């Protein structure tokens, strides 16, 4: 047997051995868990290996490390959030990352009062930077496509659990929230708001005040009714939560005359301004909107 044939045979044997190792499990999650989640921010191989090495459940041995480095010569790894099942082989893991077969995350938020808080909550769960989200919320030309402006946009967000991709773009994220908003405002809900002589936006603003007043569900319709009556007769709402919002100090437990006077020119102060504030003072719960 000549040297060339011997070399080819050795290469084939080594390839077969490497392939057999590629088929072995690379993921072994903790007892009681069924999966591990891996976040990939970019296609950089070293950054990817660092992420993998940080996961105790992933066995980053020579086979996996070599497979990733060899694959990176010909293919790129797609950013995203990937669920790795217990017992997943090296080959399946690498293929999933190369083909970008990412898995959606569950995005949630509640008890949000300001745009800054919302941007922070969302960015903590997504690849997006809070500034990227803030830029959309402050751009009237972008918001116009959703029938919103910088004052009304916070009413588009509804506390819920949303399935989105971790590396979702700002415009796609807004599309997701807008779709949920449109689905929520059914004909029945719109008719109810119309019967109360308010718009869906006004109902949401009023609900944000009611949400600040109480968390006890049986009280919500009563509080909403009280404010609706004041609204319809042209009386100032005199809602303490609006003054708290105007001060920007959400730790306040009691609103005094000093707080009211200090914010008297603020349009959110319903002690000094007739009607509803120009926007929500928090993102209200769906149940509170339904109570209006």
Question: PLM features: what roles do these ranges have?
Answer:
Residues 1-35:
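N-terminal type II signal-anchor transmembrane helix
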């Amino acid at each position: 047997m000549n040297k060339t044939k011997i070399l080819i045979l050795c290469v084939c044997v080594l390839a077969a051995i490497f392939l057999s190792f590629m088929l072995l499990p690379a993921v072994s999650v903790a007892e009681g868990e069924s999966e591990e989640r891996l976040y990939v921010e970019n296609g950089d191989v070293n950054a990817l290996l660092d992420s993998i090495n940080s996961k105790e459940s992933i066995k980053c041995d020579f086979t996996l490390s070599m497979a990733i480095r060899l694959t990176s010569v010909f293919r790129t790894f797609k950013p995203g959030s990937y669920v790795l099942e217990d017992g997943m082989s090296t080959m399946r893991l690498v293929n999933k990352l190369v083909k970008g077969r990412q898995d959606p995350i569950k995005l949630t938020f509640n008890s949000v009062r300001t745009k800054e808080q919302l941007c922070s909550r969302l960015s903590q769960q997504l690849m997006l930077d809070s500034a990227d989200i803030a830029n959309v919320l402050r751009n009237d030309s972008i918001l116009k496509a959703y029938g919103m402006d910088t004052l009304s946009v916070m009413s588009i967000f509804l506390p819920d659990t949303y399935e989105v991709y971790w590396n979702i773009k700002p415009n796609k994220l807004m599309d997701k929230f807008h779709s949920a908003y449109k689905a929520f405002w059914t004909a029945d809900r719109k008719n109810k708001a119309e019967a109360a002589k308010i718009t869906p936006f006004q109902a949401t603003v009023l609900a944000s005040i009611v949400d600040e007043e109480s968390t006890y569900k049986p009280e919500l319709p009563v509080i909403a009714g009280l404010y609706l009556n004041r609204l319809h007769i042209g009386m100032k709402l005199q809602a303490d939560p609006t003054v708290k919002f105007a001060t920007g100090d959400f730790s306040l437990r009691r609103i005094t005359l000093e707080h009211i006077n200090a914010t008297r020119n603020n349009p959110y102060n319903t002690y000094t301004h007739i009607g509803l504030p120009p926007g929500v003072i928090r993102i209200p719960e769906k149940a509170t909107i339904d109570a209006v």
